[in-house]
Amino acid sequence: MKKIKIGICGWGTVATALHRSILENKNQIKRTHQVDLEIVAIGARRDNPKYSAGKTKVLRNIFDVLDEDIDVLVELIGGTDDAKTLISSSFEKKIPVVTANKAVIYEYGDILFREASNNGVDFLFEASVCAGTPTINLLKNDLAGNKFLSIKGMLNGTSNFIISQMEDGMSFEDSLSFAQENGYAEADPTFDIEGIDAAHKISILSNIVFGSPLPPNEFLIEGISNITKQDIYIAEKLDFTVKHVSSADMKDGKLLIRSNPALVQKSDYLSSLKNVRNGLVIDTDLIGKIHISGSGAGGEATAAGVISDIVRLASESSNHNATSKEDLKYRQISDELFSFLIIVNSSSENINSDVLDMLAEHNISIRNSGLILSLIHI
């Protein structure tokens, strides 16, 4: 049986859930995976009033964890610069790293992948996208041999939770407050509601699937803060749902990445995912479309992804390190043709005939949703 000694840096929601999960599931992991997990030390600048480390050694200087007898460092401090320095220091000491920190991968991914490779250690980050839902390993290993055509999905549980509440009649502001009260949104929700968190995640997936650099070239990032109850109502009338969708697809040898609100037909798989569910549709040449979904928020779900990476270190095929393509070409969002919706506070009888003729010439159909006229480009 292989023993793995763990050092954890960070002592927030995910770190405490990880500590608890390892202690509670230690015997099961031994039995099913033949791996003995031992938490040697925790790097925490302050105590967590909601959870005690018990008998585990706590070090106030997080970098001191690297001086302990550990086989893997779990980086859960969040942020970018300090996290990058910590991870790089771990690589220099030939200690592999597991992280759930999508921000540091987005900002420094290419540098960290190179450092891990140069030092001959693993850098695993399953929990950085879709928490504990198996995503990174699926793309890196299980789908080897497939050519990826596109990947799209809902990658932020907070945004999906808020939109789900709005579908039930709540305003955006009330939905956000409700999400915060239930622990699904941070006190400062900017990263979630402005699409930044989802943009980080689709960038990581695009790096794995298409080799795009980290950080990536500039692409469309838009959040949900401007969505109104009226938007939700109109979408419902037109047999759509509003979702925050992030995607990366290759067409004619050029890549397009985007992360923005979109109308999704009710018959679409993504439309069925509610509350904090994350979901992905992966399109490949050999086996077609693959649908996956799971909880995208919460300490326990994220801890599950971290544990899967730690256990994977005991195997021979644990490396998640990715490589960017230097000659990758991009498509611009301004060059793309999309269906779109324009809402006009009027009835068709009140619109000038010249306007109607112009719309017809450009294949823009007019549908009346009942109270508000909507225009859909098809």
Language model: regions and residue ranges:
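Rossmann-like NAD(P)H-binding beta-loop-alpha module
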Residues: 117-120, 124-197, 204
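ADP-ribose/adenylate-binding Rossmann-like module
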Residues: 78, 91-107
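N-terminal glycine-/serine-/threonine-rich beta1-alpha1-beta2 phosphate-ribose binding loop
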Residues: 1-92
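Conserved small/polar residues in nucleotide/adenosyl-binding loops
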Residues: 376-378
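Substrate-binding/catalytic subdomain of NAD(P)-dependent oxidoreductase enzymes
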Residues: 165, 176-272, 277-279
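Rossmann-fold NAD(P)-binding glycine/threonine-rich loop
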Residues: 84, 102-126
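C-terminal, non-catalytic macromolecule-binding modules
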Residues: 289-336
